[in-house]
A protein has these predicted regions:
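Short acidic, hydrophobic short linear motifs in intrinsically disordered regions
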Residues: 21-31
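Short helix-to-turn junction characteristic of helix-turn-helix DNA-binding domains
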Residues: 15-19
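Pre-recognition alpha-helix immediately N-terminal to the DNA-recognition helix
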Residues: 9-14, 26
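Short beta-strand "wing" residues that participate in macromolecule-binding interfaces
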Residues: 57
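Amphipathic alpha-helical dimerization/coiled-coil segments
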Residues: 78-107
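Short, hydrophobic-biased segments on the C-terminal half of alpha helices
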Residues: 43-47
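Short, cationic-aromatic polyanion-contact patches
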Residues: 3-7, 60-79
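Glycine-centered, phosphate/nucleic-acid-interacting loop/turn motifs that mediate DNA/RNA or nucleotide
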Residues: 53
């Protein structure tokens, strides 16, 4: 599974949060106020996500509706495994040691 750049991941997080097929307009409405993107930029990200196999697109009247093909949990698992492999050389022990900085752990 391809790793997503932050901008595309932001779009996918919105789609996963809405948990239904969505239009570009619904995605734009959910974006952070300080992070407004132009409609063409959002469409560009959606097109890339479709090319990468993360989204399917269907026509609904005049609008395109975007459907997640990869669920959040699958992506997060793949991303976690990738981080563990790339940074911690597949060692959960090294990963846990990096999280623990000498202070007591809390819940």
């Amino acid at each position: 599974m391809k790793r997503l750049p932050d901008s595309e991941l932001e779009i996918m997080m919105i789609i996963w949060d809405l948990d239904k097929p969505v239009t570009r307009f619904e995605i734009e409405a959910q974006m952070d106020q300080g992070r407004r993107l132009s409609p063409t930029t959002v469409l560009s990200f959606l097109s890339r996500l479709q090319e990468k196999g993360f989204l399917a697109v269907q026509k609904s009247g005049k609008n395109n509706v975007y459907i997640a093909l990869i669920d959040r949990e699958s992506y997060m698992q793949a991303e976690s495994r990738s981080i563990l492999k790339r940074i911690y050389r597949n060692s959960a022990r090294n990963f846990i040691a990096a999280l623990y900085d000498g202070d007591s752990l809390s819940d």
